[in-house]
Amino acid sequence: EESIAFLRDAAAINRYYETVAERIAPQLPENAHVCDAGCGVGELSLALKPYCHHVTAVDADALAIKTLKAHLIEGVTARCGDMEALAPEKPYDAMVFCLFGRTQDTLRIAKKQCRGRIFLVKRDYSHHRFSAGKVSLGEYTAGSTENVLREKGIPYTVEHFTAEFGQPFRSLEAAERFFALYNRSESEVLSKDEIRARLTAGPSAEFPYYLPHKKALCLFTIETAAISKEEAV
């Protein structure tokens, strides 16, 4: 699937996943078994491995898990299926939810499956970046997460940071396909000239075009002990 190819190209030339892992690493217990929930193609799982004993990467997308399995390293296990149905035999020491799931759902899953800290990585902006018009991200934002945690009285720490995760392209046609794939606007599309105006010179002969994207993110850290048992229902 082309979306996976785009993602792997972006991961290969940016330190995005390494940057996220470096923010989480100091807060991980020693020799931890970490779950990367909604791992996608597993780039963050691989980036987390140097900082822990084992990473279990879970995603419901069979193609994403197949892609990860083709690039597995020692100490990373890939599992395909629904997060709630794939509970570990022993609770995880930590769980990471990177741009995955509604906050209420992650709290419920974590209370059942984790005995330590959970890390929620959320977008620190409100609108979709690759759409023609203004398309809201709704509840999948840092602001929404803060509202939920405050409402439930769950203590947390939060760290704001940025990580470059631009998209390289092999051709202008690839850039056009990218915007067609990720445009969430129901009525508007970007013209070829508008797409070209967003691009800069690429990093190499293989990728002559580049779409810059400095991603503003928030890292929420929560102790599962602070999540009430009612959240697990």
PLM-predicted stretches and their roles:
Residues 1-16:
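Class I SAM-dependent methyltransferase Rossmann-like catalytic core
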Residues 14-31:
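Conserved alpha-helix/loop element of class I SAM-dependent methyltransferases that forms part
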Residues 31-40:
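Conserved class I S-adenosyl-L-methionine
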Residues 41-82:
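Class I SAM-dependent methyltransferase SAM/SAH-binding core
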Residues 93-106:
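A short SAM/SAH-binding and catalytic strip from SAM-dependent methyltransferases
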Residues 115-128:
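Conserved beta-strand signature within the Rossmann-like core of class I S-adenosyl-L-methionine
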Residues 138-153, 157-159:
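Short alpha-helix
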Residues 160-233:
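Conserved Class I S-adenosyl-L-methionine
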